[in-house]
Amino acid sequence: MKFNLIFVCLLFSIISICYGNINFSEKIHEKSLVKNQNNSILQDDEIEIGYIIEKFPWCHASMEINYSIESVIAVIKDVENYYKFFDSLSLSKQNTDDVVHIRIDMPLPFSDRDYTVVFDEVVDGNEILYSYKAVVSKDFPEMKNCVRLVNAQGEWYLYEMDNNKTYVRYTWNGQMLGDFPKWGYKQAWTRQGNEIISCLAKEVERRNYDQN
């Protein structure tokens, strides 16, 4: 079975706080999940990964992608096809009420994880926040041999940069529940962050290549 956990951007404090030369708008900041910037770094590379422990362990992974913000958000919003391009997902399905059911393929001996969420989008100039939170849906009851992540929550933050580049930051609740050992959390978060950002970048590149 494929390893990794995916569930499915942004931990910024105030409008004048910057990442590199990026200023985050007040509108985006107000909608973001985590305000505290004092996070611990798990990986400082092309893909940066970190976390902060509050009510939940909030994890984040970020990277600059060499394509337009329109190309990147188109892939992120294609939720029904997540299982086709995010390696650890075995199911992604959306009902008529826009509730999305996602299942994560876990390695033996661990049970799979799944969650049901709704998405929300905020656009402010050259910034996009695409967030999700857990909901209960009668269309997607809990499944046997699968741990339901009842606190699933996260967000994608996109910033349109110069030269047709997009800064992408994905933030998610790293809580795993069930039978997953606490000592394995940091390794799992690092693998998850690398997978979700690299798979996104590959899919954006593939779609742009197919169009040319």
Show which residues each predicted segment covers.
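Beta-strand elements of well-folded, non-transmembrane domains
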Residues: 65-67, 104-108, 121-125, 136-138, ...
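Hydrophobic ligand-binding cavity/cleft-lining segments
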Residues: 20-97
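Sec-dependent N-terminal signal peptides
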Residues: 4-14
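Hydrophobic-ligand binding "helix-grip"
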Residues: 88, 114-163
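Mid-length scaffold segments of soluble, non-membrane domains
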Residues: 78-123
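A short acidic/glycine-rich loop-to-helix N-cap element
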Residues: 141-148, 174-195
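Hydrophobic pocket/interface hotspot
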Residues: 72-73, 82, 119, 168-170, ...
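Short, highly charged C-terminal tails/helix-capping segments
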Residues: 203-212
